[in-house]
Design a protein with these regions (language model features):
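A charge-rich, low-complexity, intrinsically flexible signal that marks solvent-exposed coils, linkers
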Residues: 1-165
């Protein structure tokens, strides 16, 4: 699942369920469906499974304070014979997404301690389109970030900087 998160800076939280947690990466530019793009994905702490459908406002001053949108949701399956834990330890996770927005084959490759690259693999779901701009709304509520902030008592002006112009 992917959450669009307007905290101190706009980023996308890319999360894969593994056991009893959501293994998570912060992707500053958001995912790209263009196989030519390599997106930085910074490993962050695991999150509880209950966070998968959180959409709302985290109060300013708390960790991650800002507006959160459920930008994409779906399932994934690993490609190959390795377990998730083994692929994570080796620093190369190859998987197929079946989300509302993101589909097809993807790879996460570790390039440093916490640094990974998120890449779309060439397949029929690949495209030369900015998916984040083309499909900016929540998959749960169809709201933009500013709408979520308005409805949940957050900073509408700050949240709106994460919405398309």
């Amino acid at each position: 699942m992917v959450q669009k998160h307007r905290a101190s800076a706009l980023h996308y939280d890319f999360r894969l369920e593994a056991g009893s947690v959501l293994v998570s990466w912060a992707v500053p530019k958001g995912p790209s469906v263009d196989p030519k793009d390599k997106r930085l994905a910074m490993a962050v702490e695991d999150h509880p499974l209950g966070y998968a459908r959180f959409e709302g406002v985290i109060p300013e001053g708390e960790y991650g304070g800002g507006t959160v949108m459920v930008w994409d949701i779906g399932t994934y399956r690993l490609e190959g014979d390795e377990s998730f834990d083994e692929a994570l330890r080796k620093g190369r996770i190859v998987f197929t997404l079946n989300g509302k927005k993101l589909k097809g084959s993807w790879t996460l490759v570790r390039t440093g301690d916490r640094k990974w690259l998120l890449m779309k693999r060439k397949d029929r779901s690949a495209a030369e389109v900015d998916i984040a701009t083309a499909k900016p709304r929540s998959v749960l509520t169809r709201r933009l970030l500013a709408g979520i902030a308005r409805d949940e008592g957050g900073d509408v002006v700050k949240a709106a900087t994460g919405d398309p112009s």
